[in-house]
Curated annotation (Swiss-Prot):
<dbReference type="GO" id="GO:0045135">
    <property type="term" value="F:poly(beta-D-mannuronate) lyase activity"/>
</dbReference>
<dbReference type="InterPro" id="IPR008397">
    <property type="entry name" value="Alginate_lyase_dom"/>
</dbReference>
<feature type="binding site">
    <location>
        <begin position="140"/>
        <end position="141"/>
    </location>
    <ligand>
        <name>substrate</name>
    </ligand>
</feature>
<comment type="similarity">
    <text>Belongs to the polysaccharide lyase 5 family.</text>
</comment>
<keyword id="KW-0732">Signal</keyword>
<dbReference type="InterPro" id="IPR022859">
    <property type="entry name" value="Alginate_lyase"/>
</dbReference>
<dbReference type="InterPro" id="IPR008929">
    <property type="entry name" value="Chondroitin_lyas"/>
</dbReference>
<keyword id="KW-0456">Lyase</keyword>
<protein>
    <recommendedName>
        <fullName>Alginate lyase</fullName>
        <ecNumber>4.2.2.3</ecNumber>
    </recommendedName>
</protein>
<keyword id="KW-0574">Periplasm</keyword>
<feature type="binding site">
    <location>
        <begin position="67"/>
        <end position="68"/>
    </location>
    <ligand>
        <name>substrate</name>
    </ligand>
</feature>
<dbReference type="Pfam" id="PF05426">
    <property type="entry name" value="Alginate_lyase"/>
</dbReference>
<feature type="binding site">
    <location>
        <position position="258"/>
    </location>
    <ligand>
        <name>substrate</name>
    </ligand>
</feature>
<comment type="function">
    <text>Catalyzes the depolymerization of alginate by cleaving the beta-1,4 glycosidic bond between two adjacent sugar residues via a beta-elimination mechanism. May serve to degrade mislocalized alginate that is trapped in the periplasmic space.</text>
</comment>
<feature type="signal peptide">
    <location>
        <begin position="1"/>
        <end position="26"/>
    </location>
</feature>
<dbReference type="GO" id="GO:0042122">
    <property type="term" value="P:alginic acid catabolic process"/>
</dbReference>
<dbReference type="GO" id="GO:0042597">
    <property type="term" value="C:periplasmic space"/>
</dbReference>
Length: 371
């Protein structure tokens, strides 16, 4: 048989194989990184749990909040103490459910007390029932709170949903109600943040994409997954050849802090994409790696940022270990230098409610130091 004849025979079958393989991958349920499958550490009994705090009232009002940078110029870098306090007061219940969900899930995954799980699900179910955080009446700070809250709650929930201990098996009705609410909120977050002009696309868009990625996996929605990946690529392509983000450089004395703040959502999205067969590490010539290295170098020598934008950098935020929680997913994607790993181990465990709790437990359990 001539090779051309053989090719004619093979091409349709190879095409068929490619189509089958592609559709099988597309049909595979979305999943989180392996650490989310961890079982509950131990199931304790007795009444040593801390009880269930009073539930924060479901927030169903307009998402119109004052910005902590109110009155600041375009750089949005000068804190307004009065408006920050007003913001904290009006968003207190939202922050309480974010922090409370993260805390209770961590406690339950450690102690396995049914009361901890019941408390978490009761809070989330009540907010879902009330259709909280879904107002179409919002300003920029309001839509920012919506995506932060969704990311916090959905990413903590993932540990319950995927744990090999299957804690949600006997709570299916509540789980469905909560997931339907997350799903609806993610649709609104996409609407809030989709297709912004590039000069308006910054860390907020990356955090929005993270909340949508966490929800995509919690609800197995490929359309949400694809949107989060799309937004990641926009962000990665904003990183310049030297690892700077031009829109974050505009933040003057807080430029380095905001570069660091842009990293957690990007690293988490790349990590989640990776386990679902989408490798984002190479996007824009390893943009994520370049950004991480630029920030770590900047922490060591902030002058690199001062030379870039002419402003001495405010290092306050960069003295907080949890602000470097992005190192967990980042060092699972790239081979981190020994010096970086040493820094990571000194700062562990990384607990941050906006990423769903204890990331060290998820990504580097060998270095988990307990709670």
């Amino acid at each position: 048989m001539q090779s051309t004849d053989l090719k004619r025979l093979l091409i349709p079958s190879l095409l068929g194989l490619a189509i089958v393989t592609g559709s099988a991958q597309a049909a595979a349920p979305l999943r989180p990184p392996q650490g989310y499958y961890a079982p509950v550490d131990k199931f304790k009994s007795g009444d040593n749990s801390e009880g269930c705090d009073a539930m924060p009232a479901p927030y169903t009002g307009a998402l119109q909040f004052r910005s902590k940078y109110e009155g600041s110029d375009k750089a949005r870098a000068t804190l307004n103490v009065q408006s920050e306090q007003a913001f904290r007061d009006t968003t207190a219940d939202i922050t309480k459910i974010e922090r409370g969900t993260s805390k209770r899930v961590m406690q339950f995954m450690r102690d396995g007390r049914p009361e901890q799980l019941d408390c978490t699900l009761a809070w989330l179910s009540a907010w879902a029932q009330a259709d909280a955080l879904m107002s179409k009446d919002f300003n920029h700070t309001g839509k920012s709170m919506r995506k932060w809250a969704l990311g916090s709650m959905a990413s903590a929930y993932l540990r319950l949903k995927f744990s090999d201990s299957h804690p949600l098996a006997t709570h299916q009705e509540q789980a469905q109600k909560i997931e339907a609410w997350f799903s609806k909120m993610a649709d609104q977050v996409v609407s809030d943040w989709d297709n912004l002009p590039l000069d308006k696309t910054n860390n907020h868009s990356y955090w929005a994409a993270w909340s949508v990625m966490a929800t995509a996996v919690a609800t197995n929605r490929r359309d949400l997954f694809d949107w989060a990946v799309k937004e990641y690529k926009v962000g990665a392509n904003q990183v310049d050849a030297d690892g700077f983000l031009p829109n974050e450089l505009k933040r003057q004395q807080r430029a380095l802090a905001y570069h660091n703040y842009a990293l957690p959502p990007l690293a988490m999205i790349a990590s989640f994409a990776q386990v679902n067969g989408v490798d984002l590490r190479q996007e824009n010539h390893e943009a994520l790696k370049r950004l991480g290295e630029r920030v770590l170098a900047g922490v060591k020598d902030p002058d690199t940022f001062e030379k870039k934008n002419g402003k001495q950098q405010d290092m306050t935020d960069l003295k907080v270990d949890s602000k470097f929680a992005w190192l967990e997913p980042y060092c699972s994607l790239y081979t981190c230098a020994p010096e970086t790993l040493e820094r990571k181990h000194k700062m562990q465990p990384f607990k941050t409610f906006r990423l769903g709790g204890d990331l060290t437990k998820v990504y580097d359990p060998a270095h988990e130091k307990g709670s």
